[in-house]
């Protein structure tokens, strides 16, 4: 609201220092008739996918000299600090093709995907390991960047042959974030696991070979 009645209109320009975090009503116009009636500036939070915590923006209210009563030209700008609270949480999602992961000792493969739930400010590196590399091996690492964070990447599970009659064997595939090589916001994210089953290709029996 103005502190005194103007002889003509007074136009206030309102700007945000970071429109990626907060936008504002752009102008207010006071006249000799409404100068003492408060007008509202609406500040609106802007969503992004970046894990950036609470961000402060400076809202500046200034007199538009070219469109205002000359008596207000020398009035100094005033500012308000607006804080935008982040709604993005570090995490990742695994999706198994067909809802399960199965391979065979004949060397068949199956895949599941990994994707980040929020955009990091720097790389996030995953380490993938198999609890039994004698039954199933896996893609060893995945790297997500600020640019490809929302594009699912494949982890390939490959069955490993042996000569043992051991039936169907389950292996635990662990997907974990490599803290030392990843964005700090993801350091506390828990590991996730996938169970992979390997079907045996060995059959009990014996072979006779006749000499001559």
Where in this protein do the model-derived segments appear?
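Short boundary segments that mark the start of a structured unit
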Residues: 1-212
